[in-house]
């Protein structure tokens, strides 16, 4: 027998500190024990080293745990051994284990009352989280109440809580199957008796970035996703729209966890939620949110159509699913992916997002939702289990180890890894100092000797990281807050740390590899600087917050979709938690401008409220243990919600706070190591282990911990507690405490490591403390009973152990829900952590309070719910959601925050809807709502209207097709007949490939037949056969008469022949198989004809009636029967057929009689009706000779006498079908011809004269770039027109930043014009187009002089910035609104109507700053922001207006500026040219151009003679300012083609006026350069053209004469637009006929096409535009696209535009119910005041002396903030010296806005205060050009510098609250009662009535109150007051 090797001496070592500690001995010991399946080794009683076995070991089972529990309870110390032997008192202990360490910590806490902390340190993948689970399992076994008692089930809840966090926070990585992606502080809370009663879990830095990162090979996302996808039941999967794991971008990985069943884990997760008391509805919400995140990850985006739109979602179905689950509208959700809201200075700005940026927002949304869900789950668990006060706690700290991504698989180290590594570095430093420094310093204080062990201290690295002044974290946070770049980061780090040993920086040359490296205690880690600062800033999208959280400010009166947030209270509640910090707009608390999800925990570790420690006194059985201190707090660590901090700084503060909380605790250490990097069991990598031992300093720790004291007591306390032991050892009480303790140490043979006696305290090792305490425990009955009951008690195992794969039965645990200590959460989904509805947490959470049913829970929304909802099946779980989804939420009653408006439909509208219903009745509504996803009724109605219009268009196109292709064949059916000449043309000589031959009236294709004949008869060459081409070969094929004709009786002799003479073809003998031949085949001819008719027949011989008459005149017996021509001439001439019998056969009399096989009556018909149609006559013979005879005779005629068919191709109906198309074509060509004639103008271009008319050059801009805007503005400035008489008016439609722009459009415009960047006037209110409260808009006004190329031109900029609470495209209301702003303003100027604040500011800037009265302007010149105008164009347009006073609008020629940019632009050049020089020139003949392009046109504002308003008339403004755009027709008119519709309105309201085309006025614009943009543009143009022309057709009195009226031209234009696809298709068909079928060339059609394009070509030839030849070729090649594909695409996409959030429901009796979420708009909320009233009042209040200025006295007791109207010249801001255009000393006019005197709402406007502005006084040096002697003198522009006071003006909307104390009525007593307007009185009366008791209110009392308010006698105004009181009370 082989001898066993002796066991190693290191195998039995359980404590490393007991060795002669060296690195080698430590490694060998660890290796020996690890190989022997002993992964645990002690460093000291308070420190443990663990080597992960990478497999499950039996020592971690419940059986092993039971041994350690027994060891804990065992307290009968039997003294053994010699008293002189050192350590004789030590108990024999089990092998080191985490169970032992955890129970020791609990023992220490239980006996001392001191709080304990167990810190687990180690690299990632070393098993720290599993050690924590085992430690908690061990502690819960000894701390739970007995089964059946209160609190006995909290152990299951603790396990459930840990498992839930593990599911949502752990992931599979390359280094760890259960990698924790967050750090945890788990606090087990105990009462004074040591019973577990609470749990607090604090998360330190959750790695939220993993959610949106597609897993690299070998890794997975968070476990919860896979559990849900793999384990959800079928019904839930269907509801949540779940697929396979591979279907989701966030989950797509190639790894499968070994030994883990995701399906089973899902069941365990649900069970854990159940054990936590979470309701079924909340579980459903959690899983629904998980599914939403998965669907979010699958969203894909496509680029926009251009710079004016953001990215769009490709998979709209997925978007709808996400929107439904998140409780928001799909349109609102899609907006956050296309638009981003940022704060630029003080204004909200919108920027467009591309596909890549949209993907970033998508991922941010997913990260935000998941991290908030994780925080909510953790906080929900804490709310459930955490105590506010308790006796003591044991905390377990598990922070991730050093993270080190290799970068080889696409991953790199960034902020996440930096923060986690900093925490590990900080924790390691704390452990080092705790082990080496704290104990030594404590011993030195007590004058005890402990040797100092040198160790590696990482304080230098930590100081470099966390130095508050200049540390790395401080630098990073500072740069992040300043939004600096990556190069700035590297530069700053290089300056500060270039010589630091813990830092190295990579060169800045390669930006992609820019990085810095930190030498951590575990080795160097390289961090990439890519997006490092941006990630550190940790800014959460405010659009996401606003979308899902909504506006929670109660004072906000603006109701929007985003203002209400998610309709799902659970989702909305996530954003109401404390870990979201938000900053609001300075003028609107409801507008979030910055947000951040904090990484700092909302809770903090508990602390001891009295900083003292006392051992727990020994109590008698049943006695209640008490102490004079409590532990708790830290449950509300929320910080200011308006402070935003960076990630690194927050994490630093959180970790620092965590470590500070450990100061008063007893610390226990676990060092978890990785025996190898391959995660293989039983493999010990010596090199890796050596590195870990060194990095953690285990050798030095083992040396230092050779002296380890775990308990510290004062001398007195020790003597009192262990007095019995002292007396037992014979140590009397009389001596001093120190002497007694020294005697005890001597008697027990203790060394200094066991007991250290200091100056004030005595220090005990854990073993000695355990010995002494066990001696006391042995006398405690409670401890004895617990030990005795241990054998009868079953351990409460962890049901969620990773090594417990079998399904755990929880049936026996059902009573857990009856336990009063477990209170289920409110079954409503509204409960969790929502703002204004925080969960109620009792201050003590005592069990007695929980059992009370008198205080119900208060859930979100104020509902009281006291019932406990049990766990439901999947059907019940989602039943409410499923039923809810089946109901159309958009067709129901208005929801919260929505407004309903009712108005009536017009009769025409109702008729149209009725027609649409008739046309589309066959499409059920549920198909549109369920299948097509059209949830809203108005969208479904628009789709039906679109379909109806398309059906009408298709019908018209069908009619055109019918006329073109079908009408001819219907009138003149196609005949396949050939005349003799046509047959002759198909001879072998003339057409060898199409040789035809005729046989008895039928024509056959000889070319195809000949090869088959050669195959059958090879001796006859094909050429011989082809010689018959073009001939009649009837004689070549003799017929057997008896086989083809039955005669009169039904049979005839077989010897009867067709002719009496044998004049057949010489080759007929080869086909003669008649009866008299030797080879008789009676049916051969019939069989051959059947075959040939089927395969080779191409038609018949054709004979016209003229031919028949000619033959009849020649004596032939020919007739027509059933359109077939028959010839019986030979039969009649021969008096029958012939006879021929074979040799030897005699003919009988019957044979002779059978020669007349045709009836005499039939023969007579041919004789006497030759050349006529005998169809009727022959049919009538049936009554005479019998129908049988007639039928047989017809057969004989068809087989023997047929000559061909009747040829009707030259009949009248056929001629009509030909010439009707010709006539229509001629009409079309004639229109082109007239257009050509109208375009012919010869002669040179004359230079226009200079004019003195004032012109406004309006430039609306949206998102154009700086280059485009500068070109446009400069071109206007350079116009050869008097600079003083033109005003450049730029309207910025919204504060939006377009693609490629680095700043918003208003900022670009102001930079171009040279406005000072510091000038920032207050926004002013005005009324815009929009739904509800969207009509209230705000804008800023800037004015000044712009100098360019020697021109100095005044400008006015109106920047529409919107109200501060607008987020998406603030201020943007569309181009039509920009036009309406100017038209409204000029209309009010003309009629002196009251104006809003913005209009008054515009008036002031134009009149008092620029110096021109706005009423002087006569023309409005409209130019788009991408258009450049020729310098002579304005003069030419004005000349046309001056030449003809009846012209109301003119336009010039617009060409393409980017013609050669792409093939798309090239194909448009010729189209632009022809559309102007043909179409517009032709329309201009009639004075009615149907579309004046908005990019280059001019309108007359008023008539020159009568001063009648024209373009600014009420009619045009009223129709054009239609605010209710809710139908398909209106949207196409007002949203897609506003310029064309504006022209339509001009023609409609002023039919006597003209619109003209001025061919010599030029401008260039930018055309679409891509197919996608072109599709978008032409879709708008084509559809708006159709709808506008449809409007024009119904207008009366359009100019013109006869059929060439404008109405006719419009009709032709409309028709040509509609049938354009048919036209192209017909041309293609003609080409196909010519090329493929070989049809004859339609010469006439070719001539017409040549005429059309030839006339067009002549236009540019006459104009010497030779370059147009190439552009014409491009255009012709693109005709299929422009005239076929684009119209078809446009027609079908007619309803493809945003419908917004406005819903339209058709009610009863023609009522329309409009439901929207924009709130109601109160026009009185925008104050109005006429300029005259305002100006007169200012004159009355000011005093002017010799040009001096005296500021007026304020009428109110409060002051407005003073701002200035921006007025600049070049780069100088207003308020600085400029060159004045004219300096006048006349009395100035001040601009001050007295808001109290404007009409306003009786209640305070919601826009007062936050949107307010200021009023200020000014003195102006005006450019009043209307009264100058010489208006052409421009010398004033170049006068020397003359300083002058600058005007100040700002009309702001800042009303004081009349109810506030600061409100003081104006002093009007010097003006009397008449100075008070009725509107002021009404406002005051409303305020009085609102605050008074109506039953006690009297008119006299109201008048007294008014007198008191205004300080004047109001008796003379009594009647007015009484009337106003009655009006107010009756409303």
UniProtKB/Swiss-Prot annotation:
Positions of the DEK-C domain: 1875-1930
Main location: membrane
Ranges where the Myosin motor domain occurs: 11-777
Subcellular location: Cell membrane; Cell septum; Cell tip
Changes seen on gene knockout: Decreases cellular chitin level. Abnormal capsular morphology: lower fiber density, abnormal fiber distribution, decreases capsular diameter. Increases extracellular vesicle secretion. Sensitive to high temperature.
Binding residues annotated for ATP, in chain numbering: 122-129
Listed EC numbers: 2.4.1.16
One GO biological process term: fungal-type cell wall organization
UniProt key word Membrane: yes
Catalytic reactions of this protein: [(1->4)-N-acetyl-beta-D-glucosaminyl](n) + UDP-N-acetyl-alpha-D-glucosamine = [(1->4)-N-acetyl-beta-D-glucosaminyl](n+1) + UDP + H(+)
Annotated segments matching region Actin-binding: 655-677
Inducing stimuli: Induced by high temperature. Repressed by the antifungal agent caspofungin.
Glycosylation sites: 510, 538, 676, 842, 1062, 1078, 1146, 1583
Keyword Coiled coil (UniProt): no
Region of interest (Disordered), ranges: 798-817, 1826-1847
Residues annotated as transmembrane: 912-932, 951-971, 1220-1240, 1615-1635, 1641-1661, 1668-1688
Membrane topology: Multi-pass membrane protein
Keyword terms of this UniProt record: Actin-binding, ATP-binding, Cell membrane, Cell wall biogenesis/degradation, Glycoprotein, Glycosyltransferase, Membrane, Motor protein, Myosin, Nucleotide-binding, Transferase, Transmembrane, Transmembrane helix
GO cellular component term of the entry, any: cell tip
GO molecular function: actin binding; ATP binding; chitin synthase activity; cytoskeletal motor activity
Signal peptide limits: none
Family designation: In the N-terminal section; belongs to the TRAFAC class CC myosin-kinesin ATPase superfamily. Myosin family. In the C-terminal section; belongs to the chitin synthase family. Class V subfamily.
Entry text on domains: The N-terminal myosin motor-like domain (MMD) does not seem to have motor activity but is indispensable for polarized cell wall synthesis via binding to actin that ensures the proper localization to the hyphal tips and septation sites near actin structures.
Function: Polymerizes chitin, a structural polymer of the cell wall and septum, by transferring the sugar moiety of UDP-GlcNAc to the non-reducing end of the growing chitin polymer. Produces a large proportion of the chitin that is not deacetylated to chitosan.
Protein name: Chitin synthase 5
């Amino acid at each position: 027998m082989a001898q066993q090797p002796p066991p190693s001496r290191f195998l039995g070592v359980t404590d490393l500190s007991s060795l002669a500690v060296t690195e080698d001995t430590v490694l060998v010991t660890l290796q020996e024990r690890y190989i022997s399946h002993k992964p645990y080794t002690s460093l000291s009683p308070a420190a443990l080293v663990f080597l992960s076995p990478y497999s499950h070991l039996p020592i971690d089972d419940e059986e092993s745990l039971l041994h350690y529990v027994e060891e804990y309870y065992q307290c009968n110390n039997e003294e053994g051994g010699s008293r002189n032997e050192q350590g004789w008192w030590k108990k024999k202990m089990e092998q080191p284990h985490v169970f032992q360490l955890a129970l020791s910590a609990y023992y220490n806490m239980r006996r001392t009352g001191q709080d304990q902390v167990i810190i687990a340190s180690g690299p990632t993948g070393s098993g720290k989280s599993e050690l924590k689970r085992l430690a908690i399992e061990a502690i819960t076994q000894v701390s739970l109440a007995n089964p059946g008692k209160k609190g006995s089930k909290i152990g299951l809840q603790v396990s459930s809580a840990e498992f839930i966090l593990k599911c949502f926070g752990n992931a599979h990585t390359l280094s760890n199957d259960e990698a924790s992606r967050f750090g945890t502080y788990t606090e087990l809370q105990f009462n004074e008796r040591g019973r577990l009663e609470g749990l607090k879990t604090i998360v330190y830095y959750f790695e939220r970035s993993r959610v949106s990162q597609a897993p690299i090979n070998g890794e997975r996302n968070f476990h919860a996703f896979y559990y849900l996808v793999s384990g959800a039941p079928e019904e839930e999967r269907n509801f949540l729209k779940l697929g396979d794991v591979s279907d989701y971008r966030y989950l797509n990985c190639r790894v499968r966890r070994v030994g883990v069943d995701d399906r089973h884990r899902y069941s365990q997760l649900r069970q854990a939620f159940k054990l936590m008391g979470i309701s079924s509805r909340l579980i459903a919400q959690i899983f629904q949110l998980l599914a939403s995140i998965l669907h979010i990850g699958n969203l894909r985006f496509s680029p926009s159509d251009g710079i004016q739109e953001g990215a769009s979602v490709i998979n709209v179905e997925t978007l709808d699913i996400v929107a439904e689950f998140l409780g928001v509208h799909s349109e609102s959700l899609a907006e956050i992916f296309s638009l981003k809201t940022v704060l630029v200075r003080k204004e909200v700005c919108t920027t467009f997002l591309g596909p890549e940026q949209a993907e970033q927002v998508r991922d941010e949304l997913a990260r935000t939702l998941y991290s908030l869900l994780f925080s909510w789950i953790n906080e929900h668990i804490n709310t459930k289990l955490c105590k506010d006060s308790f006796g003591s706690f044991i905390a377990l700290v598990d922070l991730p180890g050093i993270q080190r991504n290799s970068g080889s698989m696409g991953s790199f180290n960034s902020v996440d890894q930096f923060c986690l590594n900093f925490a590990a570095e900080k924790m390691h430093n704390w452990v080092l100092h705790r082990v080496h420094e704290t104990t030594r310093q404590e011993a030195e204080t007590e004058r005890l000797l402990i040797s100092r062990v040198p160790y590696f201290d990482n304080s230098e690295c930590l100081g470099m990281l966390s130095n508050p002044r200049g540390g790395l974290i401080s630098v990073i946070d500072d740069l992040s807050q300043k939004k600096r770049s990556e190069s700035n980061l590297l530069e700053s780090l290089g300056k500060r740390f270039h010589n630091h040993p813990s830092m190295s920086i990579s060169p800045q040359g390669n930006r992609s590899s820019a990085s810095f490296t930190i030498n951590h205690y575990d080795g160097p880690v390289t961090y990439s600087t890519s997006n490092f600062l941006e990630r550190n800033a940790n800014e959460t999208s405010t659009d996401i917050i606003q979308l899902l959280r909504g506006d929670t400010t109660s004072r906000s009166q603006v109701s929007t979709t985003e203002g209400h947030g998610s309709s799902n209270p659970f989702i909305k509640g996530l954003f109401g938690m404390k870990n979201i910090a938000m900053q609001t707009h300075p003028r609107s608390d409801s507008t979030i401008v910055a947000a951040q999800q904090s990484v700092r925990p909302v809770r903090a570790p508990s602390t001891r409220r009295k900083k003292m420690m006392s051992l727990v006194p020994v109590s008698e059985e049943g006695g209640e243990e008490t102490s004079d201190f409590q532990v708790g707090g830290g449950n509300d660590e929320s910080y200011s919600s308006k402070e935003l901090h960076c990630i690194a700084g927050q994490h630093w503060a959180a970790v620092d706070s965590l470590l500070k909380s450990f100061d008063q605790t007893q610390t226990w250490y676990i060092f978890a190591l990785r025996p190898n990097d391959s995660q293989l069991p039983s493999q010990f990598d010596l090199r890796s282990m050596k590195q870990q031992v060194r990095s953690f300093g285990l050798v030095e720790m083992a040396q230092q911990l050779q002296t380890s004291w775990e308990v510290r007591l004062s001398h007195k306390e020790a003597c009192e507690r262990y007095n019995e032991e002292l007396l037992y050892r014979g140590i009397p009480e009389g001596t001093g405490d120190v002497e007694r303790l020294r005697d005890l140490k001597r008697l027990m043979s203790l060394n200094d490591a066991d007991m250290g006696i200091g100056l004030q305290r005595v220090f005990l090792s854990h073993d000695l403390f355990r010995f002494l305490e066990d001696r006391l425990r042995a006398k405690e009955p409670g401890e004895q009973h617990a030990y005795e009951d241990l054998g009868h008690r079953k351990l409460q195992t962890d049901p969620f152990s990773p090594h417990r794969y079998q399904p755990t039965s929880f049936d026996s645990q059902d009573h857990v829900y009856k336990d009063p200590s477990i209170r289920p959460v409110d079954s409503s989904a509204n409960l969790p952590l929502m703002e204004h509805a925080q969960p109620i947490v009792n201050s003590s959470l005592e069990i007695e309070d929980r059992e009370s049913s008198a205080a119900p829970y208060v859930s979100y929304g104020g509902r009281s719910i006291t019932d406990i909802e049990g766990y439901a099946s999947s059907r019940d779980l989602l039943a409410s959601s499923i039923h809810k989804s089946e109901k159309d939420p958009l067709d129901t009653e208005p929801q919260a925050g929505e407004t309903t408006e009712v108005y009536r439909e017009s009769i025409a509208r109702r008729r149209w809807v009725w027609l649409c219903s008739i046309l589309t009745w066959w499409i059920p509504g549920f198909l549109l709502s369920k299948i097509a996803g059209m949830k809203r009724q108005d969208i479904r109605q628009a789709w039906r209207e679109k379909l109806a219009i398309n059906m009408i268009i298709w019908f018209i196109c069908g009619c055109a097709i019918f006329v073109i292709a079908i009408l001819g064949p219907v009138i003149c059916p196609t005949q396949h007949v050939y005349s003799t000449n046509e047959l002759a043309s198909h001879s072998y000589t003339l057409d060898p490939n199409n040789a035809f031959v005729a046989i008895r009236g039928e024509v056959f294709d000889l070319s195809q037949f000949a090869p088959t004949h050669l195959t059958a008869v090879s001796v006859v060459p094909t050429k011989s056969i082809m010689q018959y081409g073009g001939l009649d070969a009837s004689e070549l094929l003799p017929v057997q008469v008896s086989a083809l004709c039955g005669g009169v009786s039904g049979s005839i002799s077989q010897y009867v022949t067709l002719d009496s003479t044998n004049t057949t073809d010489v080759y007929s003998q080869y086909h003669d198989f008649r009866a008299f031949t030797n080879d008789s085949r009676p049916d051969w001819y019939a069989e051959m004809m059947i075959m040939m008719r089927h395969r080779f027949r191409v038609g018949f011989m054709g004979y016209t009636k003229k031919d028949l008459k000619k033959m009849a005149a020649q004596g032939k017996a020919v007739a027509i029967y059933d359109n077939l021509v028959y010839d019986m001439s030979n039969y009649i001439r021969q008096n029958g057929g012939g006879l021929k019998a074979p040799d030897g056969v005699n003919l009988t009399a019957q044979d002779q009689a059978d020669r007349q096989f045709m009836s005499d009556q039939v023969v007579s018909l041919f004789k006497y009706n030759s050349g006529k149609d005998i169809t009727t006559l022959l049919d009538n013979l049936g009554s005479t000779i019998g129908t049988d005879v007639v039928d047989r005779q017809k057969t004989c005629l068809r087989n023997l006498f047929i000559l061909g068919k009747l040829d009707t191709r030259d009949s009248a109906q056929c001629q009509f079908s030909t010439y009707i198309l010709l006539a229509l074509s001629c009409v079309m060509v004639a229109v082109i011809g007239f257009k050509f004639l109208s375009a012919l103008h010869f002669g040179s271009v004359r230079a226009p004269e200079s004019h003195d008319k004032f012109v406004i050059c309006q430039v609306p801009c949206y998102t154009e770039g700086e280059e485009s805007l500068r070109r446009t503005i400069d071109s206007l400035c350079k116009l050869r027109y008097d600079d003083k008489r033109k005003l450049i008016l730029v309207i910025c439609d919204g504060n939006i930043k377009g693609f490629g722009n680095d700043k918003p459009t208003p900022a670009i415009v102001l930079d171009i014009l040279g406005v000072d960047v510091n000038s920032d006037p207050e926004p002013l209110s005005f009324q815009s187009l929009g739904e509800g409260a969207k009509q209230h808009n705000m804008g800023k006004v800037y004015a000044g002089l712009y100098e360019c190329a020697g021109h100095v031109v005044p400008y006015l900029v109106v920047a529409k910035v919107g109200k501060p609470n607008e987020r998406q495209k603030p201020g943007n209301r569309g181009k039509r609104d920009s036009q309406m702003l100017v038209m409204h303003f000029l209309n009010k100027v003309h009629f002196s109507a009251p104006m809003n604040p913005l209009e008054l500011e515009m008036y002031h800037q134009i009149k008092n700053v620029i110096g021109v009265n706005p009423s002087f302007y006569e023309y409005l010149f409209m130019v788009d922001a991408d258009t450049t105008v020729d310098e002579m164009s304005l003069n030419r347009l004005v000349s046309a207006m001056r030449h003809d006073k009846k012209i109301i609008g003119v336009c010039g020629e617009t060409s393409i500026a980017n013609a050669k940019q792409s093939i798309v632009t090239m194909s448009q050049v010729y189209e632009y040219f022809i559309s102007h020089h043909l179409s517009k020139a032709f329309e201009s003949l009639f004075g009615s151009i149907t579309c004046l392009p908005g990019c280059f046109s001019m309108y007359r504002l008023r008539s020159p003679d009568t001063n009648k308003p024209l373009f600014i008339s009420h009619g045009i403004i009223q129709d054009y300012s239609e605010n209710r755009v809710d139908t398909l027709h209106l949207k196409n008119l007002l949203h897609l083609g506003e310029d064309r519709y504006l022209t339509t309105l001009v023609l409609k309201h002023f039919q006597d006026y003209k619109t003209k085309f001025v061919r010599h006025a030029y401008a260039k614009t930018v055309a679409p350069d891509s197919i996608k943009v072109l599709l978008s543009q032409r879709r708008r143009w084509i559809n708006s053209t159709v709808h506008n022309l449809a409007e024009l057709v119904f207008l009366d009195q359009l100019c013109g004469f006869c059929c060439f009226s404008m109405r006719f031209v419009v009709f032709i234009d409309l028709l040509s637009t509609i049938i354009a696809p048919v036209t192209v298709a017909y041309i293609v068909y003609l080409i196909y006929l010519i090329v493929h079928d070989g049809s004859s060339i339609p010469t006439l059609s070719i001539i017409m096409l040549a005429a059309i394009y030839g006339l067009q070509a002549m236009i540019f030839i006459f104009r010497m535009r030779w370059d147009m030849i190439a552009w014409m070729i491009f255009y012709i090649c693109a005709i299929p696209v422009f005239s076929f594909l684009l119209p078809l695409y446009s027609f079908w996409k007619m309803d493809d535009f945003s419908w917004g959030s406005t819903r339209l429901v058709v009610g009863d009796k023609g009522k329309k119910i409009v439901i929207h979420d924009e709130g109601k708009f109160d026009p009185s909320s925008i104050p109005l005041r006429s300029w005259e009233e305002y100006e007169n009042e200012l004159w009355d209040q000011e005093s002017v002396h010799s040009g001096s200025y005296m500021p007026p006295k304020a009428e109110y007791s409060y002051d407005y903030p003073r701002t200035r109207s921006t007025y600049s010249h070049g780069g100088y801001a207003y308020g600085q010296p400029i060159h004045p255009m004219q300096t006048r000393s006349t009395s100035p006019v001040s601009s001050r806005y007295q808001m109290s005197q404007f009409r306003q709402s009786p209640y305070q406007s919601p826009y007062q205060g936050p949107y307010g502005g200021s009023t200020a006084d000014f003195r102006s040096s005006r450019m009043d050009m209307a009264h100058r002697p010489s208006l052409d003198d421009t010398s004033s522009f170049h006068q020397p510098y003359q300083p002058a006071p600058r005007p100040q003006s700002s009309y702001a909307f800042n009303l004081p609250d009349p109810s506030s104390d600061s409100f003081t009525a104006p002093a009007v007593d010097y003006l009397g009662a008449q100075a008070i307007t009725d509107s002021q009185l009404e406002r005051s009366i409303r305020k009085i009535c609102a605050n008074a008791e109506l039953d006690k209110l009297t008119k006299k009392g109201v008048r007294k109150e008014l007198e008191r308010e205004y300080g004047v006698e109001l008796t003379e105004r009594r009647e007015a007051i009484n009337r106003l009181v009655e009006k107010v009370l009756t409303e």
